[in-house]
Amino acid sequence: MPSATSNPANNTSLEQYEVWFLTGSQHLYGEDVLKQVAAQSQEIANALNANSNVPVKLVWKPVLTDSDAIRRTALEANADDSVIGVTAWMHTFSPAKMWIQGLDALRKPLLHLHTQANRDLPWADIDFDFMNLNQAAHGDREFGYIQSRLGVPRKTVVGHVSNPEVARQVGAWQRASAGWAAVRTLKLTRFGDNMRNVAVTEGDKTEAELRFGVSVNTWSVNELADAVHGAAESDVDSLVAEYERLYEVVPELKKGGARHESLRYSAKIELGLRSFLEANGSAAFTTSFEDLGALRQLPGMAVQRLMADGYGFGAEGDWKTAILVRAAKVMGGDLPGGASLMEDYTYHLEPGSEKILGAHMLEVCPSLTAKKPRVEIHPLGIGGKEDPVRMVFDTDAGPGVVVALSDMRDRFRLVANVVDVVDLDQPLPNLPVARALWEPKPNFATSAAAWLTAGAAHHTVLSTQVGLDVFEDFAEIAKTELLTIDEDTTIKQFKKELNWNAAYYKLAGGL
């Protein structure tokens, strides 16, 4: 049976990545000062590496003191696929004209760390030698100027590295950079086309490859069916045994049960999907209930399990949401919680206690719960195929964010809504799908009105692993519009932001 780790493209571990730590100075101060700069900058990098909120290893590089070294370092970072970004700090004054060629050449995300070696001023001992050595307040302003002059997108983090908030912000940016690295090399396989007549799941795949790097291509679902029907019975036996070990399988699906063959067919779908995606080097995929060809079931539990292993997925041919799910899987990598395809399905409209019930036909990722899912089989009602097998569970309560990606003709638009996932008010005994119930920020009416006004999609990724800040950093790295709906959102201000953005992106597109 293909394993979850046999597809290198599907790796979600942040240990595969590194971020280079660059320190700026100049020869003006002499070798003794440069040695101190090197020692202290290594201490800064080591302190961040020791912090659990910083998930990607910082690799310290020798102090940069001239234009050629800076440019070469930028080019080396560009050429190294394991490098997902660079962090830069001007320990002393580093004349910024030296950084022009390097910054112009840099193609990796950039974090400007504005810090200094000492937290406190040595009030009684400070002299001008100390001032010359510890002048990031001076040097980083010069660096900030040249970045703005060149229009370099970056994140700026301010404070001493002993401050937990500094490490948290550095970690959030690293996660966003990892998501970006995953998207830049993503191969996405579509089985069939989009659901007929649906608007928001359409989009410009060529523009997506230019903007995000993702390669989106389509295969006949019957090619998938061939892989499914070619699965070895011994592999099916092993996978079914795994299902019974990991999940609460209803009796009718167990060996000897009346519907056991349906569980075996679901296992064949998983085996076929895995082998097909591995052969393509794909880490994301889509299906469509309208285009199932020779498949006997709409892929349900197979999709849920592949998402749990880090694959991106979009339903009804929605490749844009599949991109988001894959990015969220990588960004959340080692954190508790999960990420999944989600769809706003229906509402609870009790005044003052409004909630959104999210679900999908089958395909919600079990990473959203720490509880043991129940494996069930029920009619689907659409698609004209056999009853599909699926995992059923309630998403665990906690903070989350739902994010959608839409093609607005002249640009892609991300819309993110901060939410609180809550426990169900009452059981849902007749709803045989995985689901999530949440309260959107700032309130239901404002959230829904803003979402509709923005033209945001009905398919989203729900992440309970990373928050809005990571998606904000991701959008900045991707140079993609992001509209946020959070505790501070008002419709009046939100409409103004939409108008400002429309003007900005039209002007920026012509520059």
Curated annotation (Swiss-Prot):
One cellular-component annotation, GO: cytosol
Cofactor(s) the protein requires to work: Mn(2+)
A biological-process GO annotation: L-arabinose catabolic process to xylulose 5-phosphate
Pfam families in the record: AraA_central, AraA_N, Arabinose_Iso_C
Catalytic activity: beta-L-arabinopyranose = L-ribulose
Residue numbers binding Mn(2+): 316, 343, 360, 459
Gene Ontology molecular function: any one: manganese ion binding
EC number(s) reported in the record: 5.3.1.4
Cofactor note: Binds 1 Mn(2+) ion per subunit.
Function in brief: Catalyzes the conversion of L-arabinose to L-ribulose.
Family (UniProt): Belongs to the arabinose isomerase family.
PANTHER family, alphabetized: L-ARABINOSE ISOMERASE (PTHR38464:SF1)
Name the record gives this protein: L-arabinose isomerase
Organism: Paenarthrobacter aurescens (strain TC1)
